[in-house]
């Protein structure tokens, strides 16, 4: 009887967590099924039909989608996978916290309903898939972090696989990945010396992984996504330095546009597909056929060397807009029929849009807010770095901070989704840190 009284509350808490996670998954289906297709997702799905793989979007996402697609052809297959990973993550976290208190356990699936996290689960972007992949990796490691033996080793192997898979989805995460990997390898406590020791070798390993999988195993076509960053930088440097840094000559009207009118610290699309400045990429790509060649790389290197202050001004302007601006959040357009409303006659989705529209002007939907929250959590967790709870928070929030900051150098658009990993890392860390540290089990 004594044993039953001690274990019954924990069992009830775990059952409640499972029910809440299942209910959350069901709510996700009611609101979003069969998933919100974006233009990025549409391009990836079209590559499946064409049997082509490119590196502009992640070829690994194309392969993954092609594998799960027979289960529910179209957007539904990848949507169901993302939603399942999301609720599995928060369900596992709550299940693991049930031995501490029912309140902490239940708070995990409840916090999963926070608008900046939940509102993106049904939107098919690789940034969302990346976020839930890393979230699941960290939580799988956390669940077994107070144990020793084969179960923990298996959990760590799964978590490291998911960490690497996330890098393959978002290669700019390879600088942040070593922090998450260090947590997965040593989940019981965080030691900065160990993390520093593996940092550079881990970057090299993850970089090699991308090269091997993308171009060796999958044979992806090189579409030169890095040069989109360089084109954006050349436009920014030209604007701030008031000198044309593109490797082409413009006529007087084009020169005026490039130096004074085209540039906005929001996105590189202004030089690619938006009037009146899409002539820039048309000239570089179709006209002079320079895009994808060393001419762009050399022009970029010269521009940065000649005008480092202009480069920093451009990048700082972009980063400020990314962190503080009212940027694109959830996707609500119907990409198949742009003139039609997405999910007409669905009250649940309409209610979600209404809540989103009311909250969008608030700090909840600012990337900078979640960067600051991640920093605050990491500072708070530092004094508990010798515990599994502190190690978890430092691992996820530390990697989120570095990941968001990479956009200072590589960002070409300001969408809120690029900070989605920081949202998930922060939300997951809250219930972990709220209670007292747990004792280590054998």
What are these regions (language model features)?
Residues 31-44, 52-64, 68, 73-76, ...:
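Extracytoplasmic catalytic/substrate-binding loops of multi-pass membrane glycan-assembly enzymes
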Residues 92, 131-148, 159-163, 179-180, ...:
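Specific aromatic-rich, kink-prone transmembrane helix
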Residues 80-100, 136:
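Transmembrane-helix motifs of polytopic, lipid-linked glycan transferases
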Residues 72-77, 311-397:
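Membrane-interface anchor segments at the N-terminal boundary of transmembrane helices
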Residues 30, 59-62, 66, 71-75, ...:
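Aromatic- and kink-enriched transmembrane "portal" helix at the membrane-lumen/periplasm boundary
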Residues 219-342:
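Membrane-proximal stem/loop segments at transmembrane-domain junctions that anchor or position
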Residues 26, 155-170, 181-184, 199-206:
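Membrane-interface alpha helices of multi-pass inner-membrane proteins
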Residues 12-16, 93-115, 131-132, 150-153:
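Transmembrane-helix signature of polytopic, membrane-embedded enzymes
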């Amino acid at each position: 009887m004594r044993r039953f009284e001690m274990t019954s509350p924990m069992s009830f808490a775990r059952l409640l967590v499972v029910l809440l996670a299942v209910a959350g998954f069901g709510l996700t289906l009611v609101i979003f099924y069969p998933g919100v297709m974006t233009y990025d997702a549409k391009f990836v799905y079209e590559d499946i039909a064409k049997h082509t793989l490119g590196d502009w979007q992640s070829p690994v996402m194309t392969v993954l989608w092609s594998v799960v697609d027979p289960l529910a052809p179209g957007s539904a297959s990848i949507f169901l996978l993302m939603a399942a990973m999301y609720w599995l993550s928060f369900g596992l976290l709550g299940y693991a916290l049930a031995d501490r208190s029912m309140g902490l356990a239940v708070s995990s699936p409840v916090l999963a309903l926070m608008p900046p996290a939940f509102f993106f689960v049904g939107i098919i972007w690789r940034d969302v898939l990346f976020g839930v992949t890393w979230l699941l990796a960290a939580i799988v490691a956390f669940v077994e972090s107070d144990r020793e033996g084969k179960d923990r080793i298996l959990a760590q192997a799964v978590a490291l696989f998911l960490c690497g898979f996330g890098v393959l989805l978002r290669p700019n995460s390879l600088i942040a990945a070593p922090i998450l990997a260090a947590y997965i390898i040593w989940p019981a406590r965080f030691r900065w010396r160990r993390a520093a020791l593996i940092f550079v070798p881990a970057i090299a390993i993850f970089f090699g992984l991308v090269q091997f999988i993308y171009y060796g195993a999958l044979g992806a076509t090189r579409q030169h996504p890095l040069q989109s960053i360089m084109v954006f930088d050349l436009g920014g440097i030209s604007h701030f330095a008031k000198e044309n840094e593109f490797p082409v000559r413009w006529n007087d009207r084009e020169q005026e546009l490039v130096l004074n009118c085209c540039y906005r610290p929001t996105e590189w699309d202004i030089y690619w597909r938006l009037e009146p400045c899409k002539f820039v990429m048309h000239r570089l790509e179709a006209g002079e056929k320079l895009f994808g060649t060393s001419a762009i790389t050399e022009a970029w290197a010269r521009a940065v060397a000649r005008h480092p202050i202009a480069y920093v001004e451009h990048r700082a302007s972009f980063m400020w807009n990314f962190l503080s601006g009212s940027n694109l959040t959830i996707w609500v357009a119907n990409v198949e029929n742009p003139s039609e409303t997405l999910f007409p006659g669905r009250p649940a989705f309409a209610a979600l849009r209404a809540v989103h529209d009311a909250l969008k002007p608030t700090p909840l939907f600012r990337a900078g807010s979640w960067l600051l929250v991640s920093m605050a959590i990491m500072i708070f967790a530092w004094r508990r770095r010798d515990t599994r709870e502190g190690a978890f928070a430092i691992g996820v929030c530390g990697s989120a901070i570095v990941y968001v900051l990479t956009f200072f150098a590589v960002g070409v658009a300001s969408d809120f989704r690029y900070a989605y990993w920081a949202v998930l890392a922060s939300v997951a860390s809250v219930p972990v840190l709220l209670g007292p540290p747990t004792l280590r089990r054998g």
